[in-house]
A protein has these predicted regions:
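Short strand-loop junctions, especially beta-strand C-caps/beta-turns
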Residues: 16-20, 119-121
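Metal-dependent DNA replication initiation modules
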Residues: 1-13, 20, 26-73, 77
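Conserved hydrophobic/aromatic beta-strand scaffold that supports enzyme active sites
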Residues: 14-16, 113
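C-terminal accessory/tail domains of diverse enzymes
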Residues: 3, 64-216
């Protein structure tokens, strides 16, 4: 991939969370996409590139976006729908396997997990554990809602991308868009809503001691 590959001198945090099966994984992926800018903003710590301050809290994603099949994934109706997409790419010689799909969030093609790939690599182990705990709780909460037949709104990728850009540019100083209310709100309020959303599964997963995002 020429200069695209040569410029890929970046480090990110990848977190795998186990899921019961791939069908459930796709359903979780569809919903969890909405929360990607929320966790991305907390992790932003890559403002410099080639000795310059880029003006972004996280420039790493801008570098990785040069590759194909990156960014926020589209909505898929089912695992079969996703497989059809992969098969088209394989048949046309675009990729040789699904591991060449590098979205910010993906159902892993080999392991029984859903993989979060959006975050910068934190500078402290405490921050890493906190982010991993939040991602685990997001997956558990969405799965719990599915088991209770409670729906959560699916937001379009073009909307989620607006919040991702804001998180990349401003980090925790961003105002993210509340798509339900159609207003921009301070990140702190968005974070409060996320923590409230996952609160009932935090203790079930024994994540309370790790989920200390306010200490960042």
């Amino acid at each position: 991939m020429g200069d695209v590959a040569r410029s890929n001198l970046i480090f990110g945090l990848h977190v795998h969370v186990g899921v019961p099966n791939r069908e459930e994984g796709i359903r979780i992926q569809n919903i969890a996409r909405y929360f990607l800018p929320h966790i991305y903003a907390i992790s932003t710590c890559s403002p410099f590139w080639e000795g310059r301050n880029t003006g972004f809290k996280s420039f790493r994603q801008k570098i990785f976006a040069k590759f194909p099949r990156t960014g926020i994934p589209s909505h898929f109706n089912s695992w079969a729908d996703f497989e059809q997409y992969v098969n088209i790419l394989i048949k046309t010689g675009t990729i040789d396997n699904a591991k060449k799909i590098w979205w910010d969030l993906r159902v892993h093609p080999i392991y029984p997990t859903i993989e979060f790939r959006i975050c910068d690599m934190p500078l402290r182990i405490e921050e890493t554990l906190c982010l991993a705990a939040i991602m685990q709780c997001i997956v558990a909460k969405i799965y719990k809602l599915h088991q209770q037949n409670i729906s959560f709104r699916n937001y379009r990728r073009i909307l989620i991308n607006e919040n991702k850009w804001r998180a990349s540019r401003y980090g925790i100083d961003a105002e993210l868009i509340d798509f339900g209310k159609e207003i921009a709100v301070p990140y702190e309020k968005i974070l409060d809503e996320l923590l409230e959303f996952i609160d009932d599964v935090v203790d079930e997963l024994d994540c309370r001691s790790k989920n200390r995002v306010r200490d960042f």
